[in-house]
């Protein structure tokens, strides 16, 4: 929730000069945070918000743009309500505000998505629609495998309108129904960053991007470490297997083993963890790694042929799972 609060706090302090964008934000905020109620035969506009700064911003914008007074009620945390909530209500002029914001159409019927003037407005209006929706019911998770920027929507029509607004901003968003609730989700890291900037939360975007980069670096380092560990284990097992086979080859051949092959084999047995290049330097006289590899290969081949003729276990027989497990 920390990053969600950071985004909402930054957006609630954003100064927007375009009147059209300010109206689009108010409309979106009211659409996603509340609804229309009939109280005593009158239309009441209501919005429930999770930050006092958002409630104050909305109340101020309603008064400056439309001239109507909104009342904010504070619902303290208690019982099943885990945090303080702020309920903004416009009662006396509710119907007039609903018509002017496009929440009611010309015939007085509720608009199920976002009004046409917002959906077909400017790019600034599309940004404002997202800003209002996020302030109302948005969330941003920490960067990671399941990171997401998400908005809970009052219905599928509102979700599709938000997806369309994101598309106009060059951001890929998807509408989904999760446990009966409509949501719009952005999961791509680059898209999340771009949308944060579009909405006006540039400072939070920088923090989010820094955490994302740090996590990616850490994940890459872990992958490389795991890769190195796996390579070391494979190398160790190969060395143990090679030394065991050479020992068996020397046993099979006994005194019949050629001296130059025996010396290469003994180097392999005595220096089990050494590379072929290192074995070549230890030889007397020194040899290339290809020469060492060739002699060991001929030693094993000669021993395996003799074992087959004699009907005894060859050099491969000593390479058991237990031997490799202990490597």
From Swiss-Prot:
Protein name: Probable cell division protein WhiA
An MF annotation (GO) of this entry: DNA binding
GO biological-process terms attached to the record: cell division; regulation of sporulation
Keyword Iron-sulfur: no
Highest taxon in the source lineage: Bacteria
Function: Involved in cell division and chromosome segregation.
Listed HAMAP family: HTH_type_WhiA (MF_01420)
Keyword Oxidoreductase included in the entry's annotation: no
DNA-binding region: 275-308
Protein family: Belongs to the WhiA family.
Organism: Mycobacterium tuberculosis (strain ATCC 25618 / H37Rv)
Keywords: Cell cycle, Cell division, DNA-binding
Signal peptide start-end: none
One Gene Ontology cellular component annotation held by this UniProt entry: peptidoglycan-based cell wall
């Amino acid at each position: 929730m920390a990053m969600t609060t950071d985004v909402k706090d930054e957006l609630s302090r954003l100064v927007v000069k375009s009147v059209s964008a300010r109206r689009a934000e108010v409309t979106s905020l009211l659409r996603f945070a509340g609804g229309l109620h009939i109280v005593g035969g009158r239309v009441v506009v209501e919005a429930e918000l999770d930050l006092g700064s958002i409630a104050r911003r909305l109340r101020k914008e309603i008064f400056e743009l439309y001239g109507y007074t909104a009342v904010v009620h504070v619902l303290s945390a208690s019982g099943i309500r885990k945090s303080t909530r702020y309920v903004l209500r416009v009662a006396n002029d509710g119907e007039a505000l609903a018509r002017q914001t496009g929440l009611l159409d010309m015939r007085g019927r509720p608009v199920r998505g976002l009004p046409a003037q917002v959906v077909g407005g400017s790019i600034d209006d599309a940004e404002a629609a997202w800003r209002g929706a996020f302030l109302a019911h948005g969330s941003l998770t920490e960067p990671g495998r399941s990171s997401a920027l998400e908005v809970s929507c009052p219905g599928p029509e509102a979700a599709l309108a938000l997806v369309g607004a994101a598309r106009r901003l060059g951001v890929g968003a998807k509408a989904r129904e999760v446990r009966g609730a409509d949501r719009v989700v952005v999961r791509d890291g680059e898209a999340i960053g771009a949308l944060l900037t579009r909405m006006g939360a540039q400072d939070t975007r920088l923090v989010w991007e820094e955490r994302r980069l740090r996590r990616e670096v850490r994940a890459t380092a872990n992958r490389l470490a795991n890769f190195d560990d796996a390579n070391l284990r494979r190398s160790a097992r190969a060395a143990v297997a090679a030394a065991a086979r050479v020992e068996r080859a020397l046993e099979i051949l006994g005194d019949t083993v050629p001296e130059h092959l025996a010396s290469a084999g003994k180097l392999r047995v005595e220096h089990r963890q050494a590379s072929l290049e290192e074995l070549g330097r230890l030889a007397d006289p020194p040899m290339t790694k290809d020469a060492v590899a060739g002699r060991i290969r001929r030693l094993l081949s000669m021993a395996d042929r003799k074992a087959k003729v004699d009907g005894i276990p060859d050099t491969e027989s000593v390479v058991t799972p237990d031997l490799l497990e202990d490597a």
